[in-house]
Amino acid sequence: MAKGLLMTYTLWAVGGPAGLHHLYLGRDSHALLWMLTLGGGGLGWLWEFWMLPSFVAQANRAQEQRQGSGRGTPPLSLIRFVAQMIVGMYFGLVALISLSFMASFYIVGLPLAVGLGVLLVAAVGNQTSDLKNTLGAAFLTSPIFYGRPIAILPISLAASITAQKHRRYKPSVGSETLSVRLYRLGLAYLAFTGPLVHSVLCHTAVTLSYVADTLGSFLSWFSFFPLLGRLLESVLLLPFRAWKLLVGDHGISSSYFQEWEKLYEFVHSFQDEKRQLALQVFGLSEGATNEEIHGRYRELVKTWHPDHNRYQMEEAQRRFLEIQAAYEVLRQPRKPRGSWRWEETSF
C-alpha cells in the first residue's frame, strides 16, 4: 500500500523522536536509531522535516529499488560517515557505562558495541555494509588502545571507514508483518537499554567513575581547541541544568543526587585545569591582570611566530598553536568556584 505524505508528517510530529514515521515507511533501522538516540538528539528529527518527501517517494518505489538492488555502489555520503562516527562513539560510551565490569571488555565488548553502532547507521535507508569487515576493523583496532576509554574514537573511525568502503544497496527481501518487525525492534531496544538502566540504578558511583574517566579523556583531546571544548562541556552539562531547573533539589533523593553533582563538578573543573595550564604556557601566576595577559601574549607571539623561526619551523608552529589556545582560555571571564549553584538556585 502506498505511503502518504500527510500521515508521515503527522507521525513525525507526534512521535518523530521515537521513529514512528520511519516505522510507518518501513525504515526499521532508521526507526531503531531514532529510538536509541531520541531522534539524533532532536537535531536529526528536526532536520528530517525537509527530507520526508524523499523518504516517502523512496518507500513507494521500494519494489523497483529491490529489483535493481545490488547493482552499483551507493554514492559516498559525508553526512552518513560522520553519523557513523558519532553513533559508534555513542554506543561505545554506553558500553563503557554499562558493561565495563566484564572480563576482556576492551577486547570484545567495546569493539562490538562501537561496530554495531556504525553498522546501524550504515543500514539506514536502502543501504547497508559488510558485517564481517566492519566488525573486523573494530576488533583489530581495539588492542592498540587497550584499557583506554578514548579507544572508542579510533575504533569508531576505523569501523566507519571500513563500512563506507564496503557500502552497498540492500538486497531484495520479502515483506514482513508488523508484529515481527516490532518484536525485532523491541529485542534490540532492550538489549541496548537493559544493561544501561541496571548499571545506572544499581551501581551509580561506579557508573559515574567510568563516565567521568571517559569525559575526561574526550575533553583533554580538545585542549587546543577551546571554543569546541567549551561547546562540548556546555552540551554535557545541559541535561544536569535542565533537571535542576525542572525539579530542583527534591526531584530525587539527596544521596543519589549528590553522585550526579560529582559528575557535574568533574566536568566543570576542566575550566580551572585548562586555565592553570594556560598560565603555565604564558609563564604567569594566578591573579594576572588582562593587561599582563595581553602583553605576554604579544611577546610570545612575536617570539614564536613561524615566520621568525624558519630554522626551527616545527617547534615554532607547535608553540604558536599552544600560545593561541592558551590565550583563548585566559580571555574568558573566570567564574568563582561554586557559582553554578547560585545560578541554579536563583531561578
Swiss-Prot record:
- Which part of the chain is the TM2 domain? 4-50
Q: Which PANTHER family match?
A: DNAJ HOMOLOG SUBFAMILY C MEMBER 22
What is a single cellular component term in the Gene Ontology annotation?
membrane
The yes or no answer to whether the keyword Ion transport is present is no
Q: Does the keyword Membrane apply?
A: yes
Annotated membrane-spanning segments are: 5-25, 32-52, 81-101, 105-125, 135-155, 186-206, 218-238
All copies of the J domain together span 277-347
Record Gene3D superfamilies: DnaJ domain
The free-text function statement in the UniProt record for this protein reads:
May function as a co-chaperone.
Per the record, the major location class is membrane
Per UniProt, what is one Pfam family of this protein? DnaJ
**Which organism does this record belong to?**
Bos taurus (Bovine)
Q: Where in the cell is it found?
A: Membrane
Name the gene behind this protein.
Answer: DNAJC22
Q: How does the record classify its membrane topology?
A: Multi-pass membrane protein
Q: Which InterPro entries match?
A: DnaJ_domain, J_dom_sf, TM2
Disulfides per UniProt: none
Q: Per UniProt, which keywords does this protein have?
A: Chaperone, Membrane, Transmembrane, Transmembrane helix
Which named protein is this? DnaJ homolog subfamily C member 22
